[in-house]
UniProtKB/Swiss-Prot annotation:
It is a multi-pass membrane protein. Pfam families: PEMT. Pathway: Phospholipid metabolism; phosphatidylcholine biosynthesis. Residues 1-33 are annotated as: Disordered. Residues 1-65, 113-173, 221-256, 301-373, 421-455, 519-551 are lumenal. This is Phosphatidylethanolamine N-methyltransferase. GO terms for cellular component: endoplasmic reticulum membrane. Belongs to the class VI-like SAM-binding methyltransferase superfamily. CHO2 family. The chain crosses the membrane at residues 66-86, 92-112, 174-194, 200-220, 257-277, 280-300, 374-394, 400-420, 456-476, 498-518, 552-572.
Amino acid sequence: MTSSQSFLRQRKPQANDETESELHNTPEPTKQDVVWGKTPGGEVFRVPTTHDVITTLFNPRYKKSHLDLLNLTLLGFQLVLFFILPRRASQIFFLFYFAFWRGAYDAGLGWVLTKQSKKKWIVREVQRLGWLDEKRRPAVRNWIRKQLADKMGKDYSFDDLPLEYNTWLLFRQAVDVILVNDFLSYCMFAFSCFRVPEGLSVLALLILRRWLGGFLLIAFNLWVKTEAHNVVKDYGWYWGDVFFQRGNLVFDGVFELAPHPMYSVGYAGYYGLSLIAGSYAVLFVSLAAHAAQFAFLVFFENPPVAASYKKISRHVSQPSNASSNGDIEMDPNTRSLISSPRKSATSQHDLLNKYFRRDVVVLRNLDLLRSTDAMLVLIIAYALMISFLPTLSARTMLALHFLHALAWCMIHYVGLGLILQAQSKTKFLVRHFMKNYHYSQNDGGGGAIVEAFTNWKAIYNLSMCMTYVSCVGVVWKSYSLPHDWTVGNELLRHTLGALLVGLHVWASMESFEVLGVFGWFFGDFFMEEFPTHLEYTGIYRYLNNPEAMGGAAWFGLALISGSKLVLSLAVIRHLANWWFLSSVENPHMRKLYGDSLRKDAGFVKVIKNHAPELKRVAREVKGTFDKVFEETADAVEDFLAKCERSSGPRISEVVQETKVLLQQSRERLVITRVSNDISAYDSSKYHVSISPSSLTGERTFHLGEPITIKWQAPHKHSRKDWIGLYRVGANKSNTVTKTSSMGMWLPVHGEEWDGDVPLGLKRVPSKHLESENGVVTFKGNTLPWLVGHYEVRYHHDGKYNVMSMDGPLEIFVDKPSDMTFSSVRNSLMRIVPLCLDSDPSLIPFSCKDRDPDDFSFWSEHQAKRICAAIKQVFNVDYAPEVVVADANLTALANRILISKEILSTRSDT
């Protein structure tokens, strides 16, 4: 598991630089004794001393809160039931009772902690309910204050501490109830399943060993938990980092023993108790509970920790052996590797992108256009098929081999043909590798071409070999050795078949002799460095397309085997090859070589020159190849024309309608909800207006520029009102919105919403105000990241009733007048900061020892924005990983220039 996922309760507080800088005026002796915390809002406070749950719950010297009394009552309830219930009933009850508390822990706490981490949900709920507000809920506040004050020490002051800390103290009391009851209910279930084995005297030594091992595991479990608590303290034990900040994370103590010791070796006691109980039921319940705890780790705890302590990309222009003030103290072995001397000052970011480029891990990052990935999938598929293929009859096996050969035939000629056709028209393969993989700036743009062609060669050769091998498989399954070669046409069939196979081999060898590896692998579809002229030598002196003779072996094998399946396979292969030549290779040759292509093959010219009296015969000879193709094409065209006359208009209409629906489907995936009380509101009193851009002074905004909207509404307007941005023309109605905003919306009272859920806070009514106004600013993910014209709509009560509209506003992007390095870089200097939310920490131009063109990312969305902007400005596609790998304006500008040069080469040919 990666380091970003290994923070669970591995938290040892360490002084934060920012916190220390704010506390420089603190007297020196106090700094060593006092622990300081910091809220998300920046408020610094002294963290009081807390006590562990065992001490506060069972030590009579400590006062008990009402929640402590509830906890003790539940514990006593379990003990009483254990002694009064029959053994079988006790087992069933405590099984479900433990499942309840385990679910409350893993699912309940997981859900609550996730919402608190993302949206500060617990704190906001306390605010919404007014539990700690002296004016709104004084009785509840005083009760909570007493509960917390009784549990804390003398250094605790309820009124002096921030809301986040007091909310955390209240939260941890609820957590104590869950944790303690979860533990005891498991123990009660295990004890109810305990039995003394029969034949104790015979198996005494074995049982004693089992019990001894169980007690050792329990003791080890207790030691791990105790040591872990000593390291992380209550702050880490009760997930304090989702409420406030108390320091950075380091690894220490028991956390060097095993990964996630609290959730791995920290559950050894489960298996110790299973050994002592000697029950498979306890063992399987332990395994299920342990698995649920790991699910809690993976799905609930790791994501917020990773989001809090790790950025997606940090492009640091430092030598890899330089010391780093990171947020995490590394493992000693890792640290020794990092600190080893290097000859060059290459950053770790650059090294990672140099040696690792979307590598396949199991099946993650799979790319079937990479030859190694395609071969991996084939090996896995064939291995699975061999392993799970049942015993089949000879007839079924023959049909399976035929389908196998047919599939490879279609993959080779049609599948690869379509890829090659796309490469000829749009440089599809080169674009794919250029978009998804990072290449060094020093390769002059050739890296993508070389890799695309290298992978194409491997895939093409693999496909061609599998085409022949699969065909031979069908022949082998259908062939039977003749009993008498002199009877019938057996000898003739084998002779003609062998001759056709020999003709195929000769034609292929002659073709390769003329074409070489460049022509054999269709190099002119990829590379422009080679000369663009044709030489008709060898077999090409006589035939324009000797590849047409390549199917001779298939017909020869059909003769030899005498199988209709092989014959049909040969015909299908012949038609597929004809389609490939006429639709893929010949159009590309005409585009590339133009008039230098000859019309007649060599042997046709000879017949035309030396036998004019046999002109009609010559046409028939020429038709041996070309005419067959033409007649087949005419037949297919006639068939399609007949189909088109009967159903063509309807099919075209359906296709066109489908395209339109698909284009609008994302926007229209919304169930329009309208308000029933709309008649009680006067829409004329609502007003929304677009503030002009600070850059242009008009309603035109650069892509990524924040858009400010002013609104005015009656004082009694709903607190759930919201404003959305929509493409002009997306909604036909001006009274009801029927398309999705695609995330481009904001509530008019953002402080009263938890993400997309209104908190339902009540406002204090005012008799003097008739209207209320405010401002919302669209930025980041709420902005449209596609150029075009948009309109603003003010909606009522969380529904889709439109109260006011304004627009249009235009989203534009400046395109450089010429494709030079300076113009491209200047465009990026404007685009990139806007895509990074204009966060100065992500573009540290003045940071020490840093390339001034470097930039960083907080989220993958920012990298996607840059990709979208580059596509709209320069018409070049990049995957987010490529932009993250560069993370530098100069590098990105060079990449764009090289890409444009590669993609524009011969575009007008």
